[in-house]
Amino acid sequence: MLNNAMSVVILAAGKGTRMYSDLPKVLHTLAGKAMVQHVIDAANELGAAHVHLVYGHGGDLLKQALKDDNLNWVLQAEQLGTGHAMQQAAPFFADDEDILMLYGDVPLISVETLQRLRDARPQGGIGLLTVKLDDPTGYGRITRENGKVTGIVEHKDATDEQRQIQEINTGILIANGADMKRWLAKLTNNNAQGEYYITDIIALAYQEGREIVAVHPQRLSEVEGVNNRLQLSRLERVYQSEQAEKLLLAGVMLRDPARFDLRGTLTHGRDVEIDTNVIIEGNVTLGHRVKIGTGCVIKNSVIGDDCEISPYTVVEDANLAAACTIGPFARLRPGAELLEGAHVGNFVEMKKARLGKGSKAGHLTYLGDAEIGDNVNIGAGTITCNYDGANKFKTIIGDDVFVGSDTQLVAPVTVGKGATIAAGTTVTRNVGENALAISRVPQTQKEGWRRPVKKK
């Protein structure tokens, strides 16, 4: 095991023609995150001193999407092969560091596998990640003599005998910086593709008497690349299946693991139940005994113990204390906060609003820029009118207030503790404590009224 510093080169210059997209291939997402970001995260977790990103097509889009300050951007103006890509990055290599080569369209490579590869690299030699396939057609074959790796032959350049070899190159390797620069300088494009192959450094190393150690990944999916949307969708399901399995083994009840998507990180308590077609995005925390109904989307939120989220509810950047109930068909937008035992029912929307302990907003309501006290009843059809076309204003409702149905609260406005708002009221001025506010037009009644008759 070597303890050298290490830098990582990520090849991400390909256009991705078979994706049929204006977006660079490596920016297409897996589990809600760009493929290349998965690789960058692995490199950073591995402790890379520098991450050199070799880019070409769609460079402006890449730079807009990837904000990692640790990235060194390396332009490959012409795509002349993997060896050529590494040659562009070579001036940045330190002689005494390890250089690990990764690919922006191989998103599921694990830190554990890369660490094993790094540990296995012999002094002065190369660590090479390989796999054995039943059908290796199209891949570079690993050639050996007396069990030792001697080189890699690309499929188009291989003889019929070499094409029978099942061990193939994944493209992922690690070597010393000084050695890498020397070997890269010796590459030629004398092959069927007319390209500079990074794989040729294996034969160069062998000719120098250097040892090449092959390591296999834990799972084949770790080294599967993406060239089209079908392959990407398959890797998405592989990834989601792995995440679901981890959650099940950790005690989370997923009613159907095949219909659950995790697009971020999930921290959870005990006895959590998640129904079908639920999507978890960003950083989500679920307390003990949380229940989430079918079709819900939870993003960057904290859900307290004993909360129940009914079907088809969307929760984003929200915070729920214990024993809250939400939905079905509710929407909590950024800044929504529910205190203990609060209830938000169907077709209720909250944004930048706090609902106090035991308070309820049961139906068809919008609460925006609002601070609502404890034990408040918000009647159906209540709207906080928080926007005048230019600025937002706040509504404050004290404890123990009863708001009748079809009420409009025109902010800025304050409703005092214990007040009652009659149904159909438009509140434009502050309401005092324990007062009744009513602004309905007086009802009139005309006896013997006859409806108009349609003219023939």
Swiss-Prot record:
Localisation per UniProt entry: Cytoplasm
Name the chemical reaction catalysed here.
alpha-D-glucosamine 1-phosphate + acetyl-CoA = N-acetyl-alpha-D-glucosamine 1-phosphate + CoA + H(+); N-acetyl-alpha-D-glucosamine 1-phosphate + UTP + H(+) = UDP-N-acetyl-alpha-D-glucosamine + diphosphate
Question: Where is it mainly found?
Answer: cytoplasm
The residues that hold Mg(2+) are: D105, N227
Residues at the active site: H363 (proton acceptor)
Q: Which domain of life is it from?
A: Bacteria
What cofactor does this protein call for?
Mg(2+)
Q: Which CDD domains match?
A: GT2_GlmU_N_bac (cd02540), LbH_GlmU_C (cd03353)
Kindly give the InterPro entries that the UniProt entry links to this protein.
Bifunctional_GlmU (IPR005882), GlmU-like (IPR050065), GlmU_C_LbH (IPR038009), Hexapep (IPR001451), Hexapep_transf_CS (IPR018357), MobA-like_NTP_Trfase (IPR025877), Nucleotide-diphossugar_trans (IPR029044), Trimer_LpxA-like_sf (IPR011004)
What's the stated role of this polypeptide?
A: Catalyzes the last two sequential reactions in the de novo biosynthetic pathway for UDP-N-acetylglucosamine (UDP-GlcNAc). The C-terminal domain catalyzes the transfer of acetyl group from acetyl coenzyme A to glucosamine-1-phosphate (GlcN-1-P) to produce N-acetylglucosamine-1-phosphate (GlcNAc-1-P), which is converted into UDP-GlcNAc by the transfer of uridine 5-monophosphate (from uridine 5-triphosphate), a reaction catalyzed by the N-terminal domain.
Q: Which family does it belong to?
A: In the N-terminal section; belongs to the N-acetylglucosamine-1-phosphate uridyltransferase family. In the C-terminal section; belongs to the transferase hexapeptide repeat family.
Self-association and partners = Homotrimer.
What is the protein named?
A: Bifunctional protein GlmU
Query: Which gene codes for it?
Result: glmU
